[in-house]
Amino acid sequence: MTVSFPFPRIPDPGVPVLVAFSGGLDSTVLLHCLASQPTQRIHGLEAIHIHHGLHEHADAWTAHCAAFCTQHYIRLHIARVHVSHNSGQGLEAAARTARRAAFAHTLQHGHYLALAHHCDDQAETWLLRALRGSCDGLAAMRPLTPFAAGHLWRPLLTHSRAQLLDYAQQQHLDWIEDSSNADLRHDRNFLRIHVLPLLHQRWPQATAVLARNAALAAANADLLNAEDAVLLPDLLDPDGALDINALTAHPPARRARLLRAWCARAGAPPLPERGVNIIERELLPARHDSAACFTWSHTEIRRWRLRLYLHRPQPPWPPDWQPLWSGITPLILPDGGQLHLESTDHDTVPGFPHPLCVRARRGGERLILPGRTHSHPLKHLLQDIGIPPWRRASMPLLCDGEQILAAGDALLAAPLVTWLHAHRLKLRWQSHNNTCI
C-alpha cells in the first residue's frame, strides 16, 4: 500500500535547499522526500549534520548520515561545534545556540534551510510557551521565517509524526534513535511522553488543535507586529534611543509590545516579562538624573535624560593602551571599534603631520572648541552635547602630547578642525560599544 504523503513544496521554486539532517526519523523523511523530487535536485539540494560532541554515539551518527547522503548522491556538510558547559544558559540551550550558528555560517545567500519539525513538535512547542507565559510565543514555530542570509523553512508542520513513520516504513528507511529523547529531565520529552498521550485519550485531535492554535496566534501576532512597526519609529531618536514621553503616551500593554519590538529591532536578546515590569516600575518614573538600569543576558536598558538606551557593557580598556596613530589606516580600538579619517573628495588619506596618541579618558581633561579662547572641562562638554555617561567611558581621545584634539568624533578641538578642513577630511569613530546595540 502506498502511503499518502504529499511532497513539501518550496515557497520559491528554483531556490537551493539545505536540509538540517540529524539522522533521526523526521529529518530522514524530509531529506528523502526532497531528494525524490528531480526538480529540487536540479536547483540544488544539500544537507548539514551537526556533530555536537556531547553523545557517546556522535561519531556513529555522523557516519550514518554520511552513508545515507552518499547512497542518495546528496552533498553533506559536517559541522563540528563546541558546546559550552559554562554559558549560563544550560547545556540544551547552549547546544541549540551552537547549532544555529553553524547553520547560519553554512547557509548561502537567498537559500532555504529546511527543518523537519512536524505537527506534534508544534503542539509541544505551543504547550511549552503557554506554560512559560509567553504571549507572542504562542505562535510557536513559523512555517517560513528569515534566517541568517536566507530563510528557515519548516515544510512538515502540517504532518503528524505518525505520517512520517508510515512514510519511512513504506520506503524502508533507516534512522537514528536518540536515547536522550527519553530523558524526562527535559520538559519537551516530559510533554511528549506523559502529557500529550493523556490529552489524546480525552481529546484525540489535541495535537492538531494545539497546532491550529499556534497558526491562529501567529496570524494575530503578525497583525500586532505590523502595528508595532508603524508606531516604533516615531518613538526613536536618531541614535535609536527610546523617547520616554512618547512611549508613556501609549497604554501599558502597547508599551510592553513596543519595548520588545525595540529590543528585537536592535538585535538585543528577547526582553523578559520581569524586564518590562522593572522598566514600568523603576525606569519610566525615575528622576531626570537617575541612573536606573535593567540588565539581562549581557545587555542593559538604561534611563538617561528622558530616554531609554540599549547598551551592551564592555570591559574597560587596558590602562596602558595608548598607541601612536598616523591616520593613514584605520586604528582598531580595544572594544573592536575603530577610528579612521574619511576623505570628502575620495582622495588618498594623507595622514597627520606626525603620529598622534590615542587613549581612554582618565578624568580631568580639557578641550578648546573652535571659536573659543579658553578650554572647558571635557566632562561638561560631553554632558552638554548629550553623550550618555556609560558611552563617555569608552570614548577614544586623540591627543598631541597633553593637548586633547578630539573626543571620539563628537568633540573636535580648534587645531584639528582647521587641519581637517584644509585637507578635506573627517574624523570618524565607529564603536562596537555603542549607545544602542
Swiss-Prot record:
An MF annotation (GO) of this entry: tRNA(Ile)-lysidine synthase activity
One of the Pfam families matching this protein, by short name: TilS
GO terms for biological process, alphabetical: tRNA modification
Keywords annotated in UniProt: ATP-binding, Cytoplasm, Ligase, Nucleotide-binding, tRNA processing
EC number annotated for this UniProt entry: 6.3.4.19
Name the UniProt record assigns to this protein: tRNA(Ile)-lysidine synthase
Species annotation: Xylella fastidiosa (strain 9a5c)
Gene Ontology terms: cellular component: cytoplasm
Gene it is expressed from: tilS
Annotated domain remarks: The N-terminal region contains the highly conserved SGGXDS motif, predicted to be a P-loop motif involved in ATP binding.
